[in-house]
């Protein structure tokens, strides 16, 4: 990934971010790195650093952030929010910026529609995998005393997907979402 060049500043960024999420406080970040050091996405993608996103957002470099594609690396696991001593909530800043990106017509990565399809079918991003013992005996969820997976109320869940606008945002066909 290319280095982000900070050429233009959006001085209204903090108010835009706070309009979307009151929990996001990039202006309070003092770059202690607790968020980045605990971030699973930062461990996988060295260019992803929640503290740097906080600083760039606070400085008003919104165009560079949303055009870089880096925001989509966030797993929204909330580890950064939990670890932050200032309660700046990097995850809320990142989600606010991705919302701004989508509102400006910037599409999420191509894998997102497939993830949404899996979520609408399975209730989770990943499909269940088989588990095997050392002896290669395959175990079911029942064998492991795990609760049943799936969507408890499919009608309500699909309605929630419509309410949040995922069908339109990700340009999914209605028939794909209703499977």
Task: Indicate residue ranges for each PLM-predicted region.
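N-terminal leader/targeting helix
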Residues: 54-72
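Cysteine-centered iron-sulfur cluster-binding motifs in ferredoxin-type domains/subunits
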Residues: 25-42, 68-88
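Non-ligating segments of multi-cofactor redox enzymes
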Residues: 1-28, 34-38, 46-55, 62, ...
């Amino acid at each position: 990934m290319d280095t982000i060049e900070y050429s233009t500043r959006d001085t209204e960024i903090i108010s835009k971010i706070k309009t979307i999420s009151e929990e996001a406080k990039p202006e309070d970040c003092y770059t202690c790195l607790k968020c980045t050091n605990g971030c699973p996405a930062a461990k996988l993608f060295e260019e992803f650093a929640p503290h740097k996103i906080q600083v760039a957002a606070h400085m008003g470099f919104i165009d560079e952030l949303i055009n870089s594609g880096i925001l989509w690396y966030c797993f929204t696991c909330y580890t950064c929010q939990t670890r932050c001593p200032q309660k700046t909530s990097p995850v809320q800043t990142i989600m606010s910026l991705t919302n701004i990106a989508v509102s400006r017509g910037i599409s999420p990565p191509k894998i997102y529609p497939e993830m949404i399809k899996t979520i609408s079918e399975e209730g989770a991003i990943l499909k269940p995998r088989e588990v095997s013992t050392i002896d290669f005996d395959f175990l079911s969820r029942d064998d492991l005393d795990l609760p049943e997976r799936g969507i408890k109320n499919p009608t309500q869940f699909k309605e929630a997907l419509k309410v949040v606008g995922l069908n339109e945002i990700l340009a999914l066909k209605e028939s794909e979402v209703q499977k």
